Amino acid sequence: MSVLLFGVSHRSAPVSVLEQLSTNEAEQAKIIDQVLQSSLVTEAMVLSTCNRVEVYAVVEAFHGGLSVIGQVLAERSGMSLNDLTKYAYVRYAEAAVEHLFAVTSGLDSAVIGEQQVLGQVRRAYATAEANRTVGRTLHELAQRALSVGKRVHSETGIDAAGASVVSVALGMAETKLSGGLGGRTAAVVGAGAMGALAGAHLVRAGIERVHVVNRSLPRAERLAKNLTEQGVVADAVGLDDIARALVDADVVLSSTGAVRPVVSLADVHYALAQRTLAGAEHQMVVCDLGMPRDVDPAVSGLPGVWVVDMDRIQREPSARAAAVDAEAARNIVAAEVANYLAGQRMAEVTPTVTALRQRAADVVEAELLRLDNRLPGLDAAHRDEVAKTVRRVVDKLLHAPTVRVKQLASAPGGDSYAEALRELFELDPQAVEAVAASELPLITTDLDKTE
């Protein structure tokens, strides 16, 4: 069994396609349930962010597993399988491992080095673990990926430039607004993690006033209070009053995770009309960071309004440029992938080695029993010495070849050595499988260590 990845991301598809595939946790659970109904899939996890939807699964067969996952995603998105595959990418076995490590490290993000994806992978794994849809393989893969991501961010400067989607969007807004963001007013739509991140960037940019708009007013009030404590004039606005919050906003940042746009054409049109009546400036930059889109596409056609969406961010040179230490990050990922795969190959041969040692122990015990029957008068002391000697001989004979076979098995193609052991010593495949099952680790959520 190997890991299969079926995914669609900002690198392979336009925002409109990602919108069709965008899912919440409840929908992700349904996708996993459908995928696991097939006997070809034994474990599954869904990673859904504003920039990607990826299904990681442990499959019995590549083509069969690929067909199952592709069909489920096509049905959930309302697309035909043929249309979906035009935008999809597939990674299998080693390539799937390398991809997830790169994702958690921020190397596959719209803006190289952004850290939010590490938390998103953590939540995806936690959800799958809570729903018991991951077993040994995905458990070990996810835990190692989180560890690799943390190492990359702590040992390199890949995120030194604050390379998040928010910072790039605001950088683009500053170039559009004469005089930058200092002393201006912003509207932050959505008071979740992205909203809080947007607020932090706005404070650093010298923004003077922030309207925090959210469906849950108490949540908006909490973020507004936090911004006020940082020296910004901030207030909370319910989503129903969003048009009012846009009237004096020079820049709008929206990322809510809503199914439909929350910033409508009517809302922005109303805000512009109020500005006209007041004789105020019409210029407004709207940063749509939502997935699906938070902003009605028609808004971009209004005079004086410039919309920054995910497609535009991806085309921004600063978003495509690697951080200073990106190469170092890639080297870490490559080394971690090699170490992980070597460990996995070694783990695969371990049950065979254990079964061989058990087979040898059984032979020793059988011969000692035969000795007891042939020499019933042998005293206990001599019998124990003979037993120890025989066991030492067997251990010494097996030590070098078993250690060596583990070393050889860790290299690519090393599974042939385990097969050779099974053939040479006529080891029962069922006995080997029984040993492997007994050696499965207790699956525990170890999220704190990767934060």
Swiss-Prot record:
- In the record, which residues are listed under signal peptide? none
Q: In which pathway does it act?
A: Porphyrin-containing compound metabolism; protoporphyrin-IX biosynthesis; 5-aminolevulinate from L-glutamyl-tRNA(Glu): step 1/2
What InterPro entries does the database record attribute to this sequence? 4pyrrol_synth_GluRdtase (IPR000343), 4pyrrol_synth_GluRdtase_dimer (IPR015896), 4pyrrol_synth_GluRdtase_N (IPR015895), GluRdtase_CS (IPR018214), GluRdtase_dimer_dom_sf (IPR036453), GluRdtase_N_sf (IPR036343), NAD(P)-bd_dom_sf (IPR036291), Shikm_DH/Glu-tRNA_Rdtase (IPR006151)
For the ligand (substrate), the binding residues are: 49-52, 109, 114-116, 120
Membrane-crossing residue ranges in chain numbering: none
Entry EC number(s): 1.2.1.70
- Write down the CDD domains for this protein, in alphabetical order: NAD_bind_Glutamyl_tRNA_reduct (cd05213)
Amino acids binding NADP(+): 190-195
Q: What class of enzyme is it?
A: oxidoreductase
Q: What does this protein do?
A: Catalyzes the NADPH-dependent reduction of glutamyl-tRNA(Glu) to glutamate 1-semialdehyde (GSA).
The Swiss-Prot or TrEMBL note on domains reads: Possesses an unusual extended V-shaped dimeric structure with each monomer consisting of three distinct domains arranged along a curved 'spinal' alpha-helix. The N-terminal catalytic domain specifically recognizes the glutamate moiety of the substrate. The second domain is the NADPH-binding domain, and the third C-terminal domain is responsible for dimerization.
Q: What HAMAP family does the annotation carry?
A: Glu_tRNA_reductase
Q: What is this protein called?
A: Glutamyl-tRNA reductase
